[in-house]
Structure formats: structure tokens, C-alpha cells
Amino acid sequence: MRVTSGTWAALCWCGLVALCLVASAPARAAHDAAAGGSDAQELAKKLSNPISDLVSVPFQFNWENGVGPDNGLRTVLNIQPVVPFQISPKWNMIERWIMPYVSQPEALNNATGLGDITFSSFFSPNTGKSLIWGVGPVVTLPMSSDAAVGSGQWSAGPTLVVLKIHGELIYGLLWNQLWSYATVSKRARVAVNQGFFQPFIAWTRPSGVTLTLQSESIANWNAGTDSDRWTIPINATVSKVTTLGPFPFSVLGGAGVYVASPDSGPDWKLRVAFTLILPSKK
């Protein structure tokens, strides 16, 4: 990837987002976590739970290989803040953002810039049980800086997550469905009718190491042919929870192979991630 001034600006902006979220989190919770209030395995379990009570700021970098007719390289930096709120003694609200910064090869318009932003809000009962679920709306904001890395559409729909914690294992499914409902002038391509399916299973160890197998499958229901409809990667990652001064964080590395993708889609990818984590205020 060619590191441009825009790339450095995006990285600085991402760092600012992380610092603001960390600074706004309760200092007492941070002290308790660093002092052992939650051990590494418990933090690892919460990181594997998409709707846990952690304020987290993942910086996820993906290298997608085999993109376009020339089998080029696409890089995607996803910033994915997760902020939970307790709205009543029995209910939590968890807000999740996905803010991508994309660099595409020349065969796909050689575009680099901010992609569409996705916001999800889950309402989850605070039952204290091993079966956890949450449901709510998901919205895509057409904030892309280049038409080639965005849909040009406002989209919305439902989202759902269901998971089970069984000892050291966590397994479940995150799902959403998006339909476009408004168009950005002169930038729209086609209407959005897209499903997202993320089944996952994670094995957490007392050391804070987590082994995860998951998929982030996308179904383009408007695709003209079956071969263009599905994008199905199988991803395997290893992550480790540790501390940086008073703050716990996680590092992750992994790879994925695409068992199905459109003709212009990738063949395989590499992933690294760094996640700042902080327990939310009780």
C-alpha cells in the first residue's frame, strides 16, 4: 500500500477517536481492570461477546488479496468503537460503529478514502445468564469520500445477535439486513438489499489468549447471478489480552480464505488488530 498524506490523516483521526473514548470512560473502572478486577480470561470473553459491557476501540487492518481482474491488493482499516449503556436495571443498550478507510487497486478505480459508516444499536436484557441476545436497528451512512468506496445510499434495517457462553467457549451469530431508502445525488449506483451473517466460535484461555473461527458473510440479494451473490470468508484468528500501563488492551492476528466471492472479489486476506478496552461504568 502506498502511504499517502490522506492515510496518515486517517490514522491520526482514528487515534483521536480512541483517545476521546478512553478519556470519557470511568477512571475507577480502568483501575479495577488493571488491578485484576477482571482477569485476562474474563476480558477475553467479553471481547468475544459483541454486546458485552466493555467500552472497546478496535483498530482492525485487513489486506485483501486477489481483488479485481488483475488480482490486486485492497487494504481496509476498520475503526469499530463499541460503547455500552445501562438504560435500566434490566436493559442495556450497546452502540457499535464501523468506520472503514479503504485503498483499492487501479482496476477498481484506484480509490482511497473513507467508506460508508455503519451504526448499530442493540437492546439487550441484563439477565446474567449464559444465553445472551440483543436486537435493534442498523443504519449505513453514505459518508464515503469517493464514490468508488461507497454505496451512495442511505440504508437501514434490523440487526440481531445471539450467543452462548459455555465455560471457555463462546459461540453465536451476529446478523443484519440492510435496504436502501434514500439516494445521495449523482453518487448512487444500485439499490442496497444486503444481508450480513457472522457466525463465530471462540475458545478463551486463562492466559487471555483466544482462538476464534468465524465468517463475515455478505449476501447481495440484488445480484444478477448466484456466483455474484455471496461473499463468504472463513477467518481464523489468535488474540491476546494484556496491559499497557493502567489500560488493558488486546492484540490480534489471523488470516482468512474466501470460499465464495464475486468475480472481482478477493481470494484470501490477512488481518491484524489492536483493541483498547475499558469496562463501562456499572
Label each PLM-derived region with a short phrase.
Residues 29-282:
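Transmembrane beta-barrel domains of Gram-negative outer membranes and organellar outer membranes
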